[in-house]
Amino acid sequence: MHRTGLIAAAGCLATLVFASAAEAQSMTTNEVKGTSISRKWRGTAGLVTTGPDGKVIFLFGETQPSVVCSPLQVCDIELQGGEIVRDVLVGDSVRWKVEPATSGATGGQAIHLIVKPSEPGLVTSMVVTTSRRTYHIQLKSHPSQYMARVGFEYPEDVSTKLADINSRLETGGIPGTAPDKLNFSYSVSGSAPWKPKRVYSDGAKTYVQFSKSISGQDAPVLFVVSGGQNRIVNYRMNNDMMIVDYAVDKAILVSGVGWRQQKITIRRGG
């Protein structure tokens, strides 16, 4: 009788375990929608460019950066100068080691996160909270390949710099150029409420025209893509017109961060 009771109890326990596992794996409609949004943001290709000294540069907030490290090597993730780190949380804190380091003079020091995996074939996530923002980073370990230096470009910094540049520039009208000298052969792809109405160039500058409702503050940030890198060039807003002091072949307009971020691509020649 006692043995029969134990068997029955074990059977009930197994049933509860399987039921709990099944319940954990099933998802509600909102849970499915939420994980789909998160997966889409994590899976976005995003912009990756080259910075000083071979640094890999991610555009902050566009997607979840994936940093590849290797055993017996270190990955250096450099944060913004003056940024104060609050917490560093790693999903797999046993097989991944993260240590802080600093560079620069007092008052403008940059925090570096030195990342080292214990073995190849690992994937985990890391959340870094700072005085300015929160980083969501994926960590991968590879047998031999790794990113020695990683950094970020911040859209809000670009806006601040351009506002300073624009304050020192005249916001005169478009110089008189004969219509037959203008090149309208630009394609504009992507979806955003502020998507440009048209783009054209006079050979020296590029003009990006938005709807009348846009203002200088609402305008997206522009990056010129050249040599595989995202570069900041001088531009200014004149009412609904963005005037770029550069003959653009390819550029990207970015507004917002994270899953709310919107991006438009401009290409000369379609």
Swiss-Prot record:
Pfam short name (any one): CagX
UniProt KW Calcium keyword: no
One GO term describing the cellular component: periplasmic space
Primary localisation category: periplasm
Subcellular location(s) per record: Periplasm
InterPro entries per UniProt: Conjugal_tfr_TrbG/VirB9/CagX (IPR010258), TrbG_Ti (IPR014142), VirB9/CagX/TrbG_C (IPR033645), VirB9/CagX/TrbG_C_sf (IPR038161)
Protein name: Probable conjugal transfer protein TrbG
